[in-house]
Amino acid sequence: MKIYSLLVVKDEADVVGLSVADACRWSDKVIVIDNGSTDGTWELLQAMADDNPRIVPFMRYEGPFHIGLRSKAFAAFRREMHLGDWWCVRLDADEFYPGDVPALLRSIPWYCRTVKKISTDYVITHEDLAENILSGDFAADRPRLHYCLPDKRRERRFMRHSPFLVWLARWRYPHPWGFVARQSIPVDHYQYRSVEQMQRRYANRQQAKAEGCGSFSHESGASWQEYLRHRSDCTAVNTMHDNGLPPSVEI
């Protein structure tokens, strides 16, 4: 069983080295499309690829972001896949998988074609900034992020390979999806990591929306500061995993 993971990045040098190294634990290939990074993300991934053949810097795309960018990598590598293999159809640079991904996928019933993630969505709080606990170095700050959104989000992440899968550029995922597995795979999601990163995220997404990307409709705030939360509205979590986390959660 192979797992090919499809990653689109833009200006995520603060986290992508850690998340891609983590994804290489369970991915046979991490196939990367860079959407015009200017912060050294692409160069970092190329340097990592020199030492790790699982990392494939596939292409650099300077045009406007659109939801079907990953379809380009899917089309280029689908001939390497066979029945029994899996696609991570959306690997995000700010997501970490603490469980045993291959073991979970092997446990999925044969008739299920899609597996969702269930994410712990970490946030930066107003109190974090007031207490000045963050250094701006995500590797150092990750254990200091102790609050997450109260609701667990589920989104498609893995699809079983089939020669009948079709992925058009206007689609977010390949079709047909088929049956969705009851098991979901846990993900630690760090979409907010520092003030500088939140400012950059806000600017990039506003630009993408203005260019008609067809995504980020939830990004409706007036400034990056609307990413911040109050601790009273969040759930406190233990951020240190010991890899004893169960690999799946029942829906």
Predicted segments with their positions:
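Short, structured coil segments at secondary-structure junctions
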Residues: 26, 48-51
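A conserved acidic beta->alpha catalytic loop
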Residues: 34-45, 62-65, 92-93
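Conserved donor nucleotide-binding strand/loop of the catalytic core
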Residues: 51-68, 72
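Short, conserved alpha-helix that lines the donor NDP-sugar binding/gating region
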Residues: 42, 46, 66-81
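Short, acidic, metal-binding catalytic loop of nucleotide-sugar glycosyltransferases
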Residues: 20-32
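Catalytic-site signature of metal-activated, phosphate-bearing donor transferases
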Residues: 67-75, 86-89, 97-251
